[in-house]
Amino acid sequence: MNHEVMNLFNPQALAQIFDSIRISIASPENILSWSYGEIKKPETINYRTFKPERDGLFCARIFGPIKDYECLCGKYKRMKYKGIICEKCGVEVTLSRVRRERMGHIELAAPVAHIWFLKSLPGRISTLLDLTLKDIERILYFESYIVTEPGLTSLKLHQLLSEEEYMLAIDKFGEDQFTAMIGAEAIYDLLAGMELDKIANDLHAELAETTSELKQKKLIKRLKIVENFLESGNKPEWMIMKTIPVIPPDLRPLVPLDGGRFATSDLNDLYRRVINRNNRLKRLIELRAPGIIVRNEKRMVQEAVDALFDNGRRGRVITGANKRPLKSLSDMLKGKQGRFRQNLLGKRVDYSGRSVIVTGPELKLHQCGLPKKMALELFKPFIYARLDAKGYSSTVKQAKKLVEKEHPEVWDILDEVIREHPVLLNRAPTLHRLGIQAFEPVLIEGKAIQLHPLVCTAFNADFDGDQMAVHVPLSLEAQLEARVLMMSTNNILHPANGAPIIVPSQDMVLGLYYLSIVSEKEPGEGMAFADMGELHHALENKVVTLHTKIKGRFKNIDKDGKEVAQLYDTTPGRLIIGELLPKNPNISFDIVNQEMTKKNLSKMIDQVYRHCGQKETVVFCDRIMQLGFSHACRAGISFGKDDMVIPESKSRLVAETEALVKEYEQQYDDGLITQGEKYNKVVDAWGKCTDRIADEMMKGIQAVKFDPKTGRQQRMNSIYMMSHSGARGSANQMRQLAGMRGLMAKPSGEIIETPIISNFKEGLTVNEYFNSTHGARKGLADTALKTANSGYLTRRLVDVAQDAIISAVDCGTIKGLTMQPIIDAGQIVASLGQRILGRTALLDILHPVSGEVIIEGGTMIEEADVLKIEEARIQSVQIRSALTCETRLGVCAKCYGRDLARGTPVNQGEAVGVIAAQSIGEPGTQLTMRTFHLGGTAQVVDSSYFESSYEGIVELRNRNVVRNSEGHLVVMGRNMAVLIKDENGKERAVHRISYGARLFVDDGDIIKRGQRIAEWDPYTRPILTEVDGYVGFEDMVDGLSVTETTDESTGITKRQVIDWRVNPRGADLKPAMIIHSDKQGKNIAKLHKGGEARYVMSVETILSVEPGSHVKAGDVIARLPMESAKTKDITGGLPRVAELFEARRPKDHAIIAEISGTVRFGRGYKNKRRIIIEPNDETLEPVEYLIPKGKLFHLQEGDKIEKGDYILDGNPAPHDILAIKGVEALASYLVNEIQEVYRLQGVLINDKHIEVIVRQMLQKVEITESGDSDYIPGDNVDRIELDEINDHLIAEGKKPASGTPILLGITKASLQTPSFISAASFQETTRVLTEAAVSGKIDTLQGLKENVIVGRLIPAGTGGTIAQIRRIATVRDDLIVDEQRKSSNDGISKAMLTDMTANAAAE
């Protein structure tokens, strides 16, 4: 009896413990073994009695009873008849829940093909049979016969015959001379007759012989599928079905609505169709109907089954009554609403509530205010239990009554229950892990949740009506995790960059900034104060103000913990802030003795966290917040319209610019500049004007003014205070309020030439207002798009990185990356210190002068170490990286370095992949969607010169310069670089200098900081002559290849090359400029490298010299306007990040030299140029490149070129970088390019996150030589798998396989994960599952996603530890059982047991 009672709660099978899941094709025997009976009728339920029809789709005899423990006819009711089968209605007396698990089946009268194996590319059936998909379809849908046994006739095996041909063949050869079949039976016979072993051997042999690449690919494809079938034990004929499984009825319910109608799942319709057609087919076969009718019916059955499995995959979509496509079995799995993403990865949870949030400034950081009503509902079970324990109620019913009536004792008990029971707060969208944090609830009146102001940044919450959800962790373990890991006090640092995220903002910043301002001539200036008591006394009595310059003593402690006091020049306000600082020898008063802008506050909190630990920081933050709020309130800072000061010089600046623009218009009218050049210049001029007005305005607002009556300094401008402190508003917004709005962009991204001269204080004119509506609307449209795109990017990133978990402490690798500071246009964008902080040094870092070890290899670089490195002026450091980590699964802690969210070395089990994905995805919504058009925006101007950011000695690498006729040094080389070295000969900086730039320094010059190195024209690309001589034109035919425009007022003629291929007469022209060595133009000058001085012109080039004129080497003979590169949009923002992560080839991608050598020109084609690189290394073959004519191309014959140099400019394709320069170059390219996009938006992300993602993109290797392995060259194999197999081969003394790393985009990489469950839940569900089933894949459940889907703890964090403990325990149990078996006497010695335990732990 006891067993029976226990079974009440767990009626069915026991939970199975499993380590992996295997998927394969279901055999007919399997389908029958699952089934509880055959469904013979299409009926569902009786419309009068609402009881299921017998043998129908809801039959109770097959699927189980409708009510618990009650048969259909009502003869047997209640528990006592459990397990009895009623003799009248045939229903088993059991729980109705079995209707969710019992399956049925349909016996088909004719076999049908499974559409997934037929149509899901590559079609498995067609590949196996070596027929085309079209042919297979013609056979299956009864259009053609296939010859299965030609006998002695002239027909060939597997030949297709149409109806007519078949009839003719029968007439010709007789019916029994050959066999030809049609329909799925034919395919079934063919598949069943395949001898896979023999076919595999034949294919191997054929592969060895064949040379054609296409044939190889085809053979490899077929061989793979054959081997898949052999390895998995699937039989090919199982792809053709003779029985169809029917899913349990409660998974496709039929619900009666009022009014006698029914709501039903689409599947029932689809199943009814199959049953109807199948029954009709059976009847026709029994009646011996004519072949054509039977064949038609068989085709209908095939189509019905197709629609059931995957509606719309073939033929037209089957629709229901309301013209809506029916949802087939495949649709149940696919997409956001499918089983995987809707129910397995995202579930709704009990014990949760949501409400509007309001601010709770009096809360502590670890608290949140929870409305009493909500708490009562959320904690009900706990309250019932406590009421029972205290004896207030004896039954749950009584407890329920007490709670409903809200008795006073209930509130006391609620207080007890809630004490120290954390709840989780979540704000949607949860973009990173700080979107869910734990707090201790504090009961409050009212209906809104109170949130602590400091955690708003993490949640990205504001109080304009945002809502948040509350969840209650129930189990003790969950509460523990919430408290220890998720409490808001543990999330002080941002996981993306390690900077504090609990930083005062808005009002708090304003209050603290106001406290820290210094004013001149305030009362009490120059007084000295001994302690804070005196100071407060003086402030109360208005002897001093908060901003007076005073001397004050600040007490701190030294290294030994003794109190020391020091005198500082400061203000009372700063001392008040200083009072709150924790006493610590490493934290000096200087950190407060400055204007407390948001940045400085962040630095201060960071310092406190690093030196004083978490607890002190939390207390400090709370106190700082209180102080900020109270002083913001007292200061009473607000602003009126008079605070927006318009600079007096505005009208003058605008007038100057207008004059300049007029001048450009005139130059354009005179034909001196092109339309595009004019546009660039105008846009530029207005850009500069806007900036100058903004500067003037800032100067005006910042200016310190004194009150003429009292002589005291006047209060600072409120708007300036808000903006400068970082509380609200930016310089840009101030510029629009009181400067000038400046240039606007059209929706296409181009900039409108006429700027908005007014500002908001003056008000806009109608035209200006109209112009500005463009931008505003585009902004709104962009925001909507951006959110969706950013979310999708995050989803792909999480998917690709989800199994990157810290799985080992140290992999012991000797590889790493070299880190250098990032310098852009002479400015240091990211210092070396920023980039290496919190990373592990690969080798010992030595002092460049003394040679002493600053940091040992294998240790983490901390803040103090960074200072040492920067003092030693080291320029590059080798560090370990996740990219070069050699751990088999996951990443090791040493290669990853510091856990940014905690500031300590990363723990084992940390899911660094997911953190990386969130850190990159979360700021995605802040990135722009726009593609920048090169319209000469203000950004282009800034990059027309280089200034030195260091002092040192200049060295020119690949020096190739000449002095032109004006006496300037001009760069003639393509890959010249200026190096700046310090006195010890160490490189400080490298600048690549573009062709045609003017150089201001030469080899060996001494250069000062800020000195110009070179400058160039940003709007044109020059073509320079390399020799002195006289100009001659070739193929420059007026009207065909050149147009001449003469300027009437000046008489200047401008020649521009036009597209000569448009006109058929000009098809053979090759416009070029030649330099003759003599004035008569008889001899062409020779270049130094051989070759003739002939310069081929591309379309749109403007000629700068007249024929016959004399030129010196280095002179410009033609120029190509940069806006001819206007097709080249600079993709910016989100699309650029996605493009990089997806590893797409850019549209006009750069061509990179694969070898070092000398350039030669080969025979060109009609519209392509052939370039050959003759290698320096004799053992290599020359490499050829084809380049479209008309592309700007700047190499000349005989130029030396290095491996990795660009032959054609553009964005390089990441695949090329990997193939030519290797993994490290690729990593640094991707990291820098992605960081650049984020840096533009001012978002800080640590490099290591991008490296983790790139590591996941580089998991696959393409086999180049198979050695003695089973691989075929061209296979894509997991890096880890290849290593393991090679280890085995080497151990056996065989030849290992070799391969080259390949780069996969994040979508591709996610779909190629070893886990099919994870891939199927990501995208292309049907394809992934088909592939997995054919190859009989086994999912070892190693990533996070697959474990969530099967409902287990994830193998990261605490879940990873639990799994490890369980593994050790299992090993230990096995050992004990074995030992007991061996020694039949039970007295197993204690020592032995401890021994075994130790061994198990080691394993």
From Swiss-Prot:
NCBIfam families reported in the protein's UniProt record: rpoC_TIGR
GO annotation terms (biological process): DNA-templated transcription
UniProt name for this protein: DNA-directed RNA polymerase subunit beta'
Keywords linked to the UniProt accession: DNA-directed RNA polymerase, Magnesium, Metal-binding, Nucleotidyltransferase, Transcription, Transferase, Zinc
Record: residues binding Mg(2+): D462, D464, D466
Provenance organism: Bartonella bacilliformis (strain ATCC 35685 / KC583 / Herrer 020/F12,63)
Catalytic activity: RNA(n) + a ribonucleoside 5'-triphosphate = RNA(n+1) + diphosphate
Residues at which Zn(2+) 1 binds: C71, C73, C86, C89
